[in-house]
């Protein structure tokens, strides 16, 4: 049998060795009340599947009296714009499992520090009391988890018992405490497919080509790293640069030149504002000609880079 299971009754060993007092200490008392579920941040292919799981389970839980969906995330709570999910057709709700985007609507609204301005928090508490909300689920990424943290602390400070839970969702895959977030896998698949398509597009020309693919991800390189999946089909990038690794322009240029001299083309994938900024500056040092790009004279190159503001429009033309 598994070393994590008791051969006698299947109870996990960790659970079995806890005393009755310890088990009671970790268990929560029964709490009855309504539940609000909301979504925020960028939608993904699977965020609705997570929301559906929470909605369905809440509707079946005897401790939860009503289940409400917040329209457009926390703004729906602030505006008292809630949907009674118990009145929805269960068969229609089940379609959420396979429906992309955010079924309840989303927002990019960030709550302020309650020590600076607690207006929103007082309004949230007012709505919670109005509907006797004792459970709040928020489905999103880092900002959504920050919202959960702030609301939970405010409710605790004001003596209102409410269990606040974050449901992870981010294609960046950068939420602490998660191995892989819902949304990352589908985004990784999309990136790998896109890199394979770019690989084939870049090979059709009779002149050499250097292709730079910029991928989002804030300061996390999970999405960028997923481009390596294209290598399984022999269409992967030549170079991958992650924001977690310091970027050296000279080393980068040497590697690009070496691969270009060998293969006649280069595909590189990267992310991170510092990397992109360096490449944008370098791009200004060239002018477009009939046969491609040629370096500017040293004096003109210096002026172009000095005038660079960090705006992509500076070099787009």
Predicted features along the sequence, with ranges:
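Short, ordered loop/turn segments at secondary-structure junctions
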Residues: 40-42, 70-76, 108-109, 141-142, ...
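Accessory alpha-helical/coil subdomains and C-terminal extensions
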Residues: 127, 135-140, 146-161, 165, ...
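A short, small-residue-rich loop immediately preceding and capping a beta-strand
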Residues: 34-42, 134-143
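Gly-rich Lys/Arg/Thr-decorated short loops/hinges at beta-loop-alpha junctions or inter-strand turns
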Residues: 30-38, 96-110, 169-179, 206-209
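N-terminal phosphate-binding or glycine-rich loops at protein starts, especially the Walker A/P-loop
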Residues: 26-81
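Glycine-rich oxoanion-binding loops at beta->alpha junctions
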Residues: 4-28, 80-134, 143-144, 182-185, ...
